[in-house]
Amino acid sequence: MAHYNQLNFVKVAANHIKSDWGNMKILEVGSYDVNGNIRALFQGSEYTGIDLCEGKGVDIVISGVDLALPDESFDLAISCESFEHNPTWYETFLNMYRMTKQGGALLFTCATTGRLEHGTQRTDKNDSPGTQDIGWDYYKNLKKSDFDAMDLNNLFTNYVFFTDDLSHDLYFLGIKN
């Protein structure tokens, strides 16, 4: 999924880390193109998009928690607007971390306080492709405090959370220790 504020965050964060992503390996968890995507921001990279169902932007059909590629496979691991639909978001985050190279970056955007529930049977399941197909009727607006149980100071040399009160998004960027 993509919306203006989220796209801007990804673009600014990615450019802050590295001005040229050519020849880099990038993983996107939740890559199904609902209404735009971030893949175009990383021209020349080796880009792998995963999601729960086939569709535009999806290279491999698998959940982020079940992806079992080798440790430190990617220079950048990204998830945009999917953690709020994922009952295993915590484990997915840690799996993305595992697959990110030391000195590489982990970046995510997700819904936070104030965003209306979407992508469930109670709303419009088309807002979260694939989740209903595998039995995930889940929605949670995540907050920075939801990550307190992780020892982020040990996992990352630097990290930052931002909250966008206009779009009701939580943004994260961390450099793997």
Label each residue range with its predicted role.
Residues 87-101, 105-177:
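S-adenosyl-L-methionine-dependent methyltransferase catalytic module, highlighting the catalytic core
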Residues 14-20, 38-39, 154-155:
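Alpha-helix termini
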Residues 1-20:
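Class I SAM-dependent methyltransferase Rossmann-like catalytic core
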Residues 22-115, 172-174:
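Conserved SAM-binding loop
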Residues 10-16, 25-28, 135-141, 162:
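Generic detector of short, locally flexible boundary/turn motifs and exposed helical patches
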